[in-house]
């Protein structure tokens, strides 16, 4: 809130400001000049012109007060127009007294006011005071009369409305403006030619039209005498007169006329000739657009016989015949000729019903003028011998003149009718050259009968099909008709015939013969429209017909009006081949009129009954459209009103509301999964919390194999150290060690999660690995299939039921192994040579044998061999090392006694893999040489459990974690299958992709495997060779493991004796798809090299994984990369120790 200023403070502020300004004023006053008062002795007066003021002593007096104040004498003078300027010395001043007087007579028209300056000087010439202004105004007298200047002639259009400005007068008064002396009043005192006053003059000098009946054709120029009086016409004023000329401009207010009546004649079959000339008469100014005529044919020329054009020099209409007229068709023609001007008509022209129109009478009466024009028309009607004049008016108010044209008949020669003769013939009809197929005589056009004094010849016959009788015109076939003839045009053969008269000069007519091989004239011509509209001021309608048949069975048509059922009198004229002009000769009242019409085609075919044509006569508008309201035929219609528009808008809004409601509905749905804010890694584990499934019998089935470009493949994947993480079980000891692994793969959100189980000596080890690779290409169509569920529940049932007491326990470190020799990894093997368990496999194995072999096979149980003493452990530790290495560049890994190993792995790109399992058991020297392949039985997979009885000595085949069930093959079928061998000699065979071989034996010859046992030079996939035995010595494997394309190959060898294990090499060619090769060697005793040869690998497209080689017993071990993890699996009755490997 603003604070109020106290009165004391306000007073002090005002007092200070007033003293400040007073001091400043005093300071300025001390330096400024003092102003002296001046005095006008006699004020100036108004002087009237033409008055003599020279006799007066003075008219004004000037004096300065300096003269009294300083007691000095001053001298006065004048300056300005009338003093020291032209006119000189009209005003003079006494230099001593300051009296001003005039020396002449003033004239206001010359100078209306004088502005003088009085000067006061001291006697020494110095300025006594500033100049004094002296103004003398001259009063006006009415001493000047109005004066007319030069005036150009004015102009106005005839028939202009009242008040139309024509011109402005050039008249002025020299007296003072705004004074009554200069105010002028005008009036017309005379008009030539005399008559009604056509114009008037306003006080503002405007000449305007006073009468709207200006007619240039009557008077084209007016001369007016105008009087101008000042003092607004009051008495005593001055006056003057002037002459004004006004010209009347021409407008097209008169309709041009044609003389008459007009009649002409034309010759038939004549064209491009001038028929007649029609003189156009016009009252307008010659040579203008209002005068030049523009004639046109308003009616009677629907067929287009005539045309008309204007001759600009003579203003005549020239009627031309453009198309020949046939006397037999048309004998006379009545044309309606309309005439207009180039310039449009004035609005006053209204078809002769007003005074500005012209009546067209005959010779009995002339054309009236003005409003009496209508009488001229009546005079024309009653005059003797007068013509018809204008017989009708057009819809635009223009009269129509009748021109009657007679058609003269000319002697004509014969003529073929129709012009094209169609003769239908069937192609398969029997040919007879003497048979007359048709007659085509010429017609005498004058008599309408067949011509007699003529002969017929062929003019054109391309393929010589026809012969014609030269006297009768009979036509015969000269050869059989051929539908495939090249001379046919659309299935028709054309030939031309001439008819020549025998008199002099001879006349010729040409006719066309059309032989139709297939088409027939089976359609009659019909009217396109059965309803036509005719204006009351017209007398003809156009009627068009059509025919479905092709020429010559169609047009030209012949139209005929049947009198029965037809109202009124009508005639037919032809416009073209398909259209005719129906002209009435009576005045038709508005309303419907019916006509019965017959239409005949070129071959004379017409419909059985006449066709009805309805002509609706109505009053037409200026645009030519039919005004239904004038005939009383107005039809009720409907239109869209505001209410309907509003409903449409509401409907559109409702339609827009539906998508909005749908959007609101989607907002209430459950949202998408939220992304994890961290890398899940091992947090997302396969917990397998689904619980145990229902116990059911699971049949053994053979999964279907798919074939692609890479060979036999299946959807199951099981690769050793190739595609995913792999686990390995290794048995060492004097007895038989069994090893295998099981790998399962699942997908979650585009990533792969792998679980591997290792089965070694009735113990289970798990190695879970999470893979973030995109497996969309490898696992297309795999999502919890029946095979997957079967495998899953089988594992669970085996773990829960068969190995409930042998759950693995994983520890980071459990110390060193036990020094007691009796406690070892092989102390629980018991009798591994006992094959009695094969007799107790149960009905499930029998079912499997029946499916795979096709018949039951009896295998006698051999006598149990004595168990050899368990070998004494050579080392006091065993080691399980798992290492995964990603190799980006191929290189060499050197060890003391192990050759260089190059390992690379590429992701397999195949979408499917075929897997075959081979079980080879060596207990007898006998070889099964003839095993018949059994048919494959495909059964719908069902979830099942694998119930396996705990047998320490049982060797299980490593089974893949497939989406479908595996199959045991116990035969030696063709390639891509394994073999079952019992005996000492092992036959070589080729393993395809996905095949695995397990050899179990205790003795035998020195050579366990022949050369080339594992050879896949051109096949892709994975191969596994597991050799478990106790060969005393000798060469175990000789040969080469070769690889051509992508896949993985593995060799695992367990031996308890010395000797040369592997001689040869593992070769790998150029791998474009990637893969891995793994070789595992375990030796209990040193003595010879573990590996002789090398594992060679060519180029690999991507890096793979390397499993290190482990040598035991004197050999140095070098691991290319530090192990990522160490896990020791400890089971009951087994001691496993670990020790770091350097």
Curated annotation (Swiss-Prot):
Domain notes: Three calcium ions are usually bound at the interface of each cadherin domain and rigidify the connections, imparting a strong curvature to the full-length ectodomain.
Topology class, membrane: Single-pass type I membrane protein
Positions of the propeptide removed during maturation: 19-38
Short name of one Pfam family: CADH_Y-type_LIR
Cystine pairs: none
Name of the encoding gene: dsg2.1
InterPro entries with a match to the protein in the record: Cadherin-domain_protein (IPR050971), Cadherin-like_dom (IPR002126), Cadherin-like_sf (IPR015919), Cadherin_CS (IPR020894), Cadherin_Y-type_LIR (IPR000233), Catenin-bd_sf (IPR027397), Desmosomal_cadherin (IPR009122)
Molecular function GO terms recorded: calcium ion binding
Desmoglein repeat repeats: from-to residues: 948-974, 975-998, 999-1039, 1040-1071
Main location: other
Biological function: A component of desmosome cell-cell junctions which are required for positive regulation of cellular adhesion. Involved in the interaction of plaque proteins and intermediate filaments mediating cell-cell adhesion. Required for embryogenesis, specifically for progression of epiboly and normal convergence-extension movements during gastrulation.
Residue intervals on the Extracellular side: 39-643
GO cellular component, as recorded: cytoplasm; desmosome; plasma membrane
Subcellular location: Cell junction, Desmosome; Cell membrane; Cytoplasm
Keyword Calcium among UniProt keywords: yes
Keywords from the named record: Calcium, Cell adhesion, Cell junction, Cell membrane, Cleavage on pair of basic residues, Cytoplasm, Glycoprotein, Membrane, Metal-binding, Repeat, Signal, Transmembrane, Transmembrane helix
Membrane-crossing residue ranges in chain numbering: 644-664
Start and end residues of each Cadherin domain: 64-148, 156-258, 259-416, 417-527
UniProt GO BP: cell-cell adhesion; convergent extension involved in gastrulation; desmosome assembly; epiboly involved in gastrulation with mouth forming second; homophilic cell adhesion via plasma membrane adhesion molecules
Residues glycosylated per entry: 115, 490, 576
Region listing for Disordered, in residue ranges: 369-389
SMART domains per record: CA (SM00112)
Protein name per the record: Desmoglein-2.1
Topological domains annotated Cytoplasmic: 665-1142
Signal peptide limits: 1-18
Phenotype of gene-disrupted mutants: Morpholino knockdowns show increased embryonic lethality, with embryos that die developing one of two clear phenotypes following developmental arrest at 10 hpf. The first group show severe epiboly arrest with the desmosomal cadherins and enveloping layer becoming detached from the external yolk syncytial layer that continues to undergo epiboly. This results in a population of cells at the animal pole which maintain cell division and some gastrulation movements. In the second phenotype the enveloping layer is attached to the yolk but does not progress through epiboly.
